[in-house]
Amino acid sequence: MKSNAAVHRAVCAAIAVVAVSPIAAHSQNTDQLEEVVITAIVDAAAKAANQQKNARGVTNVVSADTVGRFPDPNIAEALQRVAGIAIARDQGEGRYINVRGGPSEFSAVTIDGVSISAPDPSTRAIDLDTIPSDIVGQLEISKTLRPDQDADSITGAVNIKTQSPFDYEGFRARASVGGSYNEFGGTHDRRGSGSVSNIWGDDSKFGLLFSASYSETDREVDNIETVWGRLTRPEGGSVFGIVENLFKDYNTQRERIAFTGAAEWRNTENDRFFVRGTHSKFTDDEYRNQLLVLWSEGVLLPGATDQTASFRNIRVAKQIRHRIQQNEILTVEVGGEKSFGDLVVDASVSMADTEQTYPRRDELLWRTSALGTATAPLSYDYRNSTLEPTISLFTSNQHLTPTNLSFRENAYRTSTTTEETQALVINARLPVTVGGGEGQFKFGLKLKDGERQADENRFRDRASTAAPSSPLSAFLTTTPSRNYGYDLGFKVDPALADAYFDATKKTSPPRVEQSATADYQADEQILSGYAMWDL
């Protein structure tokens, strides 16, 4: 209220000056102003709020200014601040959105109205961590669908509007840089973005814009996963118990690069032509040290409950994995709008390409022989819910002796998933008056053609000849791997692991069945139309 009052006083003061200055000027025989025009500039956030208020249906509109007030690195994290939207995270960063409590697969995402598909072949949910928040001009979230929107969502649809050269008058250049420090792991995050735009010509009818964004995160992540299952007790009956404990220690480096461009010609509000495009690339380079406690490979001893159990002959494994994941999203759209009297027609042709690749997903696993006996078993105890579960392995520390673990296998996987989509859209609208009320009649057609391909190749070698020439101890660094209160030993040297991967990858036997069943191709053609009367 204080700031609004200050603005009000400033405006009143300006009007007062305008009102008295001609009189003073006249009395001093100076040139008199015939007309004074005061033009107000509406804040982008206020404009978005006005759009939201006047929207047909339940809609949220978020401006770039609002997004920029928070250090959100990607679109998913920017959307989490909208009422009714939650996000699913990966390594601490937002990746998928949930609109009004529905699954991520039930939401559709478009960029400037161009539908995009999920890069991940295993889900329909869109990886929104691929798109940085710096390229946003406006976010539009529709929680109820209208007939003129694609019927490819259930819970809601998100339209990511990129910046336009007509968002501001004249030449404008903007740049920003930022950074942060992560206390856990002592790493840093970096980001920077910039845009330049201008409008030219008679009455400023032609505009160009280019923007770019770059960010990089370096983080360490601890993770504990537990696999549960039904265990058959030797004395009869069964309990719901633990099959595996997975202790994961990640070192991740993520990079996002994005570019947007737009060329627009505007004669009037309903007479315009545009060409625009976006390109986003996300790279996740990850090393994972993992300790696996394989209860399922042991023998359950009598006395097990749903919270405690003892085993003999279990196995423990230590794994290093190097995985690189790359996501790319490209959209290009050419279109325009033209008025013919009261009839307004808009049309566009667009293409959207998405791609996910795993250039490397390399794993090296060492495993112990059977651990635990009937008289000295290994056990877990989950009865104290306020403390970390008690696992006797971390008391006996058998996993900390490198000579207890020997080579088990190497495994390699590469995959590429692509989808190419082309669309043609034509809409028309005509104002109508019914019973003294004004509205519009709107109708349109859309043709969409898409092709999706997935290709995966898997390899694995368990032969003794594939074992590293050096024992596990030679691969270990002096960097401890601790997951919460659990001592996992020392981390594997990533350079030595990569050297082993590069030397053995070509000789690892293919897993033909697993590779073939992961491959597929799907084609889709959709012709749709609608008509609506909006009052």
Where are these regions (language model features)?
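Outer-membrane beta-barrel transmembrane strands
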Residues: G178, H188-S197, L246-E286, R315-L364, ...
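Cleavable N-terminal targeting peptides that direct proteins into the secretory/outer-membrane pathway or into
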Residues: M1-D31
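Flexible glycine-rich, low-complexity coil/linker segments exposed to the extracellular/periplasmic environment
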Residues: A304-I314, A374-E409, D455-D519
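Flexible, surface-exposed loop regions and adjacent strand-edge segments
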Residues: S193, I224-R233, Q290-L300, D362-G372, ...
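N-terminal periplasmic "start-of-domain" segments of outer-membrane beta-barrel proteins
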Residues: E34-F70, Y96, S104, V114, ...
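Outer-membrane beta-barrel translocator/receptor signature
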Residues: A118-A125, D134-I141, D148-T232, F240-V243, ...
